Amino acid sequence: MRKTRVEKARQAFLNGDLETHRNLHSPEEIGKEPWHKAEQGKYIGQAVYGASDGIVTTFAAISGVAGANLSPTVALIVGLANLFADGLSMAIGDYLSEKSEKDYIKAEREREFWEVEHFPEAEKLEIKEIYKRKGLRGEKLDALVDAITSSKDLWVETMLHEELGLFEDDTSPLKSALVTFFSFVIAGFMPLVTYVFASTWTFVAEHRFALSCVITAVTMFIVGAVRQAVTGVKWYKGGMEMLFVGGMSAAVAYFIGWLLRTIFGIVM
């Protein structure tokens, strides 16, 4: 995927590359910048965080089963149940959250249009106060207020952003939920690969949890490294952070499983 000007500028900043940064801020480069996200770039955040949650929660689940020394069949059942139930729950939560936010912004936009229509002077004064607090005074302030209030659409959007702190993107709640679900399931399936295909190879069957740890660690690092597309952190730092968080979660789950087996003598 071709990097945008903003992504190149972010990388130049991280590398301390002043010359590249200067070139990216030339009038020609700024003029070529598309001011709307490409369709495939809108849902990167959901995909990355869905994958992160999927692999961590699933691996923690089977680690708990391994710590309790339960059968591989139990691990597979628990892992798959956790994978699809948590994935669906997360996707539904994502959908409801985004839809609620969009509905709220829509209602606030309608209210602001109504106020601009019925109380224009009061709303104009609010715009003036907003920018006065930002340090503008005199003719510059008056000119800016006149420019903003000359368009009702711009006027209302400014009130939404500056007064209410509301910003709306053009992502689809349904698409966002689907991206979250499938990224969760795909990444979350990786810790279960050795359990699913254990019957095919004897070596895999004998070392399924150890091999699952290796596969999961590699996948966690990759998912963490990809996070830099969203957070801007160094790829190796993102990978190590993800590996640490996932490892700690799995270690705690394994310990709890072992502790319960020791206390209650669970055997399955």
Locations of regions flagged by a protein language model:
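Interfacial loop-to-transmembrane junctions
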Residues: G224-G247
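Structural signature of hydrophobic alpha-helical transmembrane segments
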Residues: E206-V218
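Juxtamembrane boundary at the C-terminal end of a transmembrane helix
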Residues: F255-M268
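Cytosol/matrix-facing amphipathic helices and coiled-coil assembly/linker segments
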Residues: R2, A9-G45, E98-T180
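Transmembrane alpha-helical segments and their cytosolic interface motifs
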Residues: Q40-I62, F167-V193
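Alpha-helical transmembrane segments of multipass membrane proteins
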Residues: A85, S89, A187, P191, ...
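Juxtamembrane transmembrane-helix termini in multi-pass membrane transport proteins
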Residues: V48, S52, V56-A81, A91-G93
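Hydrophobic alpha-helical membrane-embedded segments
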Residues: A81-I105
